[in-house]
Regions:
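Extreme N-terminal leader/activation tails
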Residues: 1-34
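Short amphipathic alpha-helical "recognition" segments used for binding
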Residues: 9, 19, 47, 65, ...
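N-terminal segment of the canonical double-stranded RNA-binding domain
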Residues: 14, 26-100
Length: 116
């Protein structure tokens, strides 16, 4: 299993842990990530924790610097369920846009990430 596959599996597993598995971009441009598998993913990206209360927080600009503009996470009112890859949105388990599931989109994004 590649590093990208391992990270993707860890990210997918985090949705069963009861914590956020995605981040919320706040008004300060931070991506807030509550304790979950995303902690390890953020650390693997070498991003600083801004110590936002109750969450891990990363500057959106740092996320984009590490991953490019193609990837960041958001949380919707119905739950934590979307990932943005390029200009396509992927809802859990559904094939939309260019036909990728969000898991496939994440793996593709990881493979394109600098340093990988």
């Amino acid at each position: 299993m590649t590093t990208n596959e391992t990270l993707a599996r860890r990210w997918l597993a985090s949705k069963h842990w009861g914590g956020w598995r995605v981040g919320m971009v706040d008004t300060c441009g931070r991506v807030n990530v509550a304790p979950s598998g995303m902690d390890a993913l953020g650390e693997s990206m070498g991003l600083p924790d801004l110590d936002h209360p109750g969450t891990r927080a990363f500057l959106l600009e740092d996320v984009r610097r590490a991953w490019g503009d193609a990837v960041y996470w958001m949380s919707g009112p119905g739950g934590h369920h979307v990932v943005k890859c390029g200009y396509q949105w992927f809802n859990e388990g559904k094939r939309v846009g260019n036909g990728l599931t969000e898991a496939e989109a994440l793996v593709a994004a990881l493979e394109a990430a600098p340093g990988e």
